[in-house]
Amino acid sequence: MLIIETPLLLRREVRRWRQEGKRIALVPTMGNLHDGHMTLVDEARARADIVIASVFVNPMQFERPDDLARYPRTLQEDCEKLNRRGADLVFAPSPDVIYPNGLESQTFVDVPGLSSMLEGASRPGHFRGVATIVSKLFNLVQPDLACFGEKDYQQLALIRQLARDMGYDIDIVGVPIVRAKDGLALSSRNGYLSAEERQLAPQLYQLMMALSAQLDNGDRQIDILLEQVAEKLREAGFTPDELFICDADTLQPLSAASTRAVILMAAWLGKARLIDNHQVDLTV
């Protein structure tokens, strides 16, 4: 497995594989890899001849400097995991390589609508950072496909819109959420949880599934349902951040025409911001 830090060397390897007729998959990550990331690599491996994983903690998508500073950097361990899983190349650039003129002078990519709604409304600039780094990676690697986790539901929708709008001939593959046995969605930020908080954390998933059951039963009093969930989260020790029930295809409010809903949840538990989502079929 190759470990490369510069765009020049990355392009050289990509060019060689292209000349050999290889099908290339990209798995973008911010490192601190867990089993959820490994399923992305597995999916990429099953669909392509070459798997390129990026490990880059992207400063442009952090709105809080303290959050950026404490995000775990575990490159050596990440590379060992990726090597064992069969990745062919790890692109691990420094911020100076990706943003040589600094963030303030960096050309950026913004996806209208999706960047500023829902999670984007409370995290200004976050999705601009996501769209910019993903665009850079797409331009550098020019993959046939790219794998992203469905845990970041709005991010996945944004990247699909980005690919359509910018004309990228790239298959965007969504990979299902990987969960611990108790239901907690795997996340790099789970490492911020204390032992006691880790015991409480699955309640986010449990409350989400209870909400799903209410939707299955035909309850459409969305505001009341969300307030009930928020109160239960607070009682359990969480600080609710974002709670939405949207049309799964448009991320707009549910309408009579909606056939699928998505529950989007984010809540703080101690120092960890936990996110999760679940889709609900409204036609049954």
Curated annotation (Swiss-Prot):
Pathway where this protein functions: Cofactor biosynthesis; (R)-pantothenate biosynthesis; (R)-pantothenate from (R)-pantoate and beta-alanine: step 1/1
UniProt record similarity statement: Belongs to the pantothenate synthetase family.
Keywords (A to Z) from UniProt: ATP-binding, Cytoplasm, Ligase, Nucleotide-binding, Pantothenate biosynthesis
Binding residues for ATP: 30-37, 149-152, 178, 186-189
HAMAP family in UniProt: PanC
Record-annotated active site: 37 (proton donor)
Top-level EC class as recorded in UniProt: ligase
EC number: 6.3.2.1
Miscellaneous comment: The reaction proceeds by a bi uni uni bi ping pong mechanism.
Localization terms from the record: Cytoplasm
Residue numbers binding (R)-pantoate: 61, 155
Top-level taxon of origin: Bacteria
Residue positions binding beta-alanine: 61
Stated name of the protein: Pantothenate synthetase
UniProt GO BP: pantothenate biosynthetic process
PANTHER family referenced in this protein's UniProt entry, alphabetically: CYTIDYLATE KINASE/PANTOATE-BETA-ALANINE LIGASE (PTHR21299), PANTOATE--BETA-ALANINE LIGASE (PTHR21299:SF1)
One GO cellular component term noted in the UniProt record for this chain: cytosol
UniProt keyword Transferase present: no
Function according to Swiss-Prot or TrEMBL: Catalyzes the condensation of pantoate with beta-alanine in an ATP-dependent reaction via a pantoyl-adenylate intermediate.
Covalent S-S links between cysteines: none
Recorded GO MF terms: ATP binding; pantoate-beta-alanine ligase activity
Reaction(s) the record says it catalyses: (R)-pantoate + beta-alanine + ATP = (R)-pantothenate + AMP + diphosphate + H(+)
Keyword Aminoacyl-tRNA synthetase annotated: no
Broad class of the protein's primary localization: cytoplasm
Subunit-structure text: Homodimer.
